């Protein structure tokens, strides 16, 4: 499994989520099978990002599995829980942070895509699951 972090984003989180939910990839090729929702909350991500005054509002990424790795949804949920525990350590999902996850299977592999608003929900302070420099690589290696 590869954790490909696309980075911190400044454009509309709705555009990012629409792309992940969309029937076509970035080249305009129809996705078959269609993307499917997995966990988290699109609406909560939209609300959280609208409350952020900072330039960078959210981060996106993909957990890409190899062609021979076919985890079932129950196993994928364990991956999400482990991801949250690693990159959002000490924070409770739904209380301190929110996210959105969906699945793409159109490239002969499972891709578990995520969007995470960069704000702690109870304080409005910035959070950064992928800090710059060596810390980011340390977290990715730990996961």
At which residue positions do the language-model features occur?
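N-terminal nicking endonuclease/strand-transfer module with a His-rich metal-binding environment
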Residues: 1-143
């Amino acid at each position: 499994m590869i954790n490909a972090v696309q980075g911190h984003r400044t454009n509309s989180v709705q555009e990012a989520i629409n792309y992940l939910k969309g029937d076509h990839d970035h080249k305009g090729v129809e996705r078959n099978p269609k993307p499917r929702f997995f966990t988290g909350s699109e609406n909560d991500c939209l609300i959280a990002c609208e409350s952020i005054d900072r330039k960078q509002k959210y981060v996106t990424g993909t957990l890409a599995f190899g062609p021979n790795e076919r985890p079932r949804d129950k196993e994928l949920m364990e991956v999400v829980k482990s991801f949250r525990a690693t990159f959002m350590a000490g924070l409770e999902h739904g209380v301190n942070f929110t996210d959105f996850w969906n699945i793409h299977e159109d490239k002969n592999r499972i891709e578990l895509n995520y969007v995470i608003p960069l704000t702690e929900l109870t304080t409005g302070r910035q959070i950064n699951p992928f800090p710059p420099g060596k810390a980011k690589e340390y977290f990715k290696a730990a996961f």
